[in-house]
UniProtKB/Swiss-Prot annotation:
This is WAT1-related protein At5g64700. It comes from Arabidopsis thaliana. Disulfide bonds: none annotated. It is found in: Membrane. InterPro entries: EamA_dom, WAT1-related. Belongs to the drug/metabolite transporter (DMT) superfamily. Plant drug/metabolite exporter (P-DME) (TC 2.A.7.4) family. Residues 18-136, 198-326 form the EamA domain. It is a multi-pass membrane protein. PANTHER family: WAT1-RELATED PROTEIN (PTHR31218). Its main location: membrane. The chain crosses the membrane at residues 10-30, 37-57, 66-86, 100-120, 135-155, 186-206, 218-238, 256-276, 282-302, 306-326. GO terms for molecular function: transmembrane transporter activity. GO terms for cellular component: membrane.
Length: 359
């Protein structure tokens, strides 16, 4: 495997590290009382400020003209795949935990795969070993997500956070993210998180089609952020009229907004567009379980969130499912390449025979 073919793997790993930090820092500011709708507006606005100059200087001359139909498509993608997805994700994260956010995001492989099948961007040959591997992988991923959502089991004792155990209460006991797995708040958060990821999966699948008619990735991402910032502002101002909730000080809130705006919405979204163009939406979503592993350990150390047996078992199932699907896709791509080579050889033989007959 040469360096060029390794780039998509490197990019998706970087994307998952970026998202891990996002889960942690977002949960921290929500624990501190920041309004989730205001947070989404600020992160999208900062992303627009960051990307607009880059798009102007680097793609001003190469960007194709934007038709009205394409603009409407991008507007709807921004509304459902970015604005509403982020708003629902923010609410769900305030109800649950950073680990659950990463875990339910790992359901993206199943969501994206079925949506890609629906839109004809993926195929599934159940009778082939590749198709069976992909189907088994998706099923295992879904099983892992279900276990993470409904089963906790024994707690893993970490010496860094001893107050979890021996009957002592967690200092954030009033935070919905630390309530028992059977509580209404926890289940509500799970439902909202899954809905958010369904919208996100739809965004991943459909933006591939839009990029074919508007291939300027930087302009595309900038327009996404601009439209989303306008949409999220309308939602936030309608639901939060308290001026104090909109103030940003020199604290973690400002750091979170800048990071999520510049790095997540700006850099990660651009990298996602690049990976989707090179390898497709399902390849990108297959690496989301990596952020679960990173978040599981980081949240336990930095946010003192509970690591349970259910989290470990669910995470292992997600990783197993990930590599089942990746193996199936790699075999499928290899066979497709071999078929093209065989077809070319057959064409060459036919051409040579025709030349002999003519001569």
């Amino acid at each position: 495997m040469d360096m060029e073919s390794k780039k998509p793997y490197l990019m998706v790993t970087i994307i998952q590290v970026i998202y891990t930090i996002m889960f942690l820092i977002s949960k921290a500011v929500f624990n501190g009382g920041m309004n989730t709708f205001v947070f989404v507006f600020y992160r999208q606005a900062f992303a627009t400020i960051f990307l607009a100059p880059l798009a102007f200087f680097f793609e001003r001359k190469s960007a194709p003209p934007l038709s009205f139909v394409t603009f409407i498509k991008i507007f709807m993608l921004s509304l459902f795949g970015v604005t509403l997805s982020l708003d629902l994700n923010g609410i769900a994260l305030s109800y649950t935990s950073a680990t659950l956010a990463a875990a339910t995001t790992a359901s993206l492989p199943a969501i994206t795969f079925f949506l890609a099948l629906l839109f004809g961007m993926e195929r599934l040959k159940v009778k082939s070993i590749q198709g069976t591997a992909k189907l088994v992988g998706i099923t295992v991923c879904m099983g892992g997500v279900i276990i993470l959502a409904i089963y906790k089991g024994p707690l893993l004792k970490l010496p860094l956070c001893p107050h979890f155990y021996h009957g002592q209460e967690h200092p954030h006991r009033n935070n919905p993210g630390h309530v028992s797995g059977g509580s209404t708040s926890w289940l509500k958060g799970c439902v909202l998180m899954i809905t958010s990821n369904i919208l996100w999966g739809l965004w991943l699948v459909l933006q591939g089609r839009v990029l074919k008619v508007y291939p300027s990735k930087l302009y595309f991402t900038t327009l996404h952020c601009l439209l989303s910032s306008i949409q999220s502002f309308v939602i936030a101002i309608a639901l939060e009229r308290d001026i104090s909730a909109w103030k940003l000080g020199w604290n973690l809130r400002l750091v979170a907004v800048i990071y999520c705006g510049f790095i997540v919405t700006g850099v990660a979204y651009y990298l996602q567009s690049w990976v989707i163009e090179k390898r497709g939406p399902v390849f990108l979503s297959m690496f989301t379980p990596l952020s679960l592993l990173f978040t599981l350990l980081s949240s336990a150390i930095l946010l003192c969130e509970i690591i349970s047996l259910g989290s470990i078992v669910g995470g292992l199932l997600l990783i197993i499912g990930l590599y089942c699907v990746l193996w199936g896709k790699s075999r499928e791509e290899k066979n497709s390449g071999d078929d093209k080579i065989d077809l070319q050889k057959e064409n060459d033989v036919v051409c040579n025979e025709v030349k002999v007959v003519i001569s």
